[in-house]
Amino acid sequence: MASDVLVKCVVWDIDNTLLDGVFLESAGEPPPADPVLVAALRELSNRGLLQALASRNPPEAAEYVRNVTGADFAAVECGWGSKAEAIARIATDLDVPVDAIAFVDDDMLERAEVAADLPDVLVLSPEDAADAVDWPQFSPAVITAEARRRGRLYAERRSRQAAASVFGGSRDEFLRHVGTRITIAAATPSDLPRLQELSVRTHQLNSAGEPVTEAELSHLLASADYEVATLRLADDFGDDGLVGAVFLAGTGATSISVPLIMMSCRALGRGALDALLAWTCRAAAQAGATELTVPCLVTDRNVPMRLALGVAGLRAEPGSVAADGRALFTRSLTGEMPELPGWVAVEAGK
């Protein structure tokens, strides 16, 4: 694992790791939690890192650990199969890249298996994990209120997915059924920390394909040459807060460019990116533009962003990828505009 990759999820073993003993070998009350590792887990949770369990234990072991640690585990894999496979499932379930996962286990053989099968995972002993709170991979530059709620947000996500799995209607009908609320508004200086966090953490839904510095974001917010809008997302399951933003350049010109559009992966499948792109097209047209352009860095990870651009009517010419790896997506603003769903509220811009 590269030293500059920020860990997004820590997967913990239970026996002799989070617990000071073996769950199934206790004659009476299960063993207590390891206070040092629980302190590390809580500190990392407060920094916005997701916590998960992968253990050769029955499900009740995970419930016990949840109770004694007070942790909001975003994913739990209890069973007798390969831990490498369990970690891969966790990565898929949480939509976290494997190279952004750390795995903590007391068993040297388990660590060796995971290291061999998933070489991009950062594999740690419990002793290493206790020190990891001081490592740069575990220290986000920005810690926002959304970050501190991340574990709970993923718990809400599981409840939402469970409800969707038994709902008989379409996606849009489900979004209405659960009271989806999207608010698009002009960004303010107080949004800067969250915008910086989104810039660093978003990969699949990020047109720039690379982080933007806090200084650059601050300049864009303050500049009269740019309009910056944020998107907040909530429903009956909970409030996700600020999950997306779009930056428009050249407002008032016949061609408006979008140097950056980004969205948290938590918003995937919930209509948020479609709504933000529809608003962007309509806002650009209302400003007098006849064309909208979005330069998008072509990466393996941001395929969902490029697909969403296509759904919004933006097209890149075949073979149009420039030397810097960016393709220019364009659409005319003189025809029919994408519709905004009824659950989208738009506040006044700057």
Model-derived features: where do they sit?
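A short helix-loop-beta-strand connector motif used in the catalytic cores of GNAT acetyltransferases and
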Residues: 4, 46-50, 218-244, 304
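Acyl-donor binding region in acyl/amide transferases
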Residues: 236, 242-320
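Terminal substrate-recognition subdomain of acyl/acetyltransferases
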Residues: 93, 121-122, 126-178, 285-350
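Substrate-recognition element of Asp-dependent hydrolases with the DxDx(T/V) motif
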Residues: 36-67, 76-81, 191-194, 208-210, ...
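Short amphipathic alpha-helix that is part of the acyltransferase structural core
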Residues: 180-211
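Metal-dependent phosphoesterase signature
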Residues: 19-33, 206-207
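Asp-based phosphoryl-transfer active-site loop
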Residues: 5-24
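Conserved Lys-Pro-Asp/Glu-containing loop-to-beta segment of HAD-superfamily phosphomonoesterases
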Residues: 87-108, 114
